[in-house]
């Protein structure tokens, strides 16, 4: 049973999460030959202050 953990920046809508869940599930069904009910997905919302890129927290990074 494949399990996927998706960590996303806070603020994604339910529709965006639904679309991601459907797309990831479909990809794993095709790649692994499992049924959709065998795919487990956890989506974890993270505040920008808890994410760093290049050693710099996202709120501290220059806006591009």
Mark where each language-model region is.
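A domain-level signal for the structural core that forms small-molecule/cofactor-binding pockets
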Residues: 1-64
């Amino acid at each position: 049973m494949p399990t996927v953990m998706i960590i996303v920046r806070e603020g994604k809508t339910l529709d965006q999460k639904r679309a991601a869940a459907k797309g990831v599930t479909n990809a794993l069904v095709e790649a692994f030959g499992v049924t959709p009910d065998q795919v487990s997905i956890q989506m974890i919302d993270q505040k920008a202050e808890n994410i760093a890129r290049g050693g710099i927290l996202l709120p501290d990074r220059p806006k591009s």
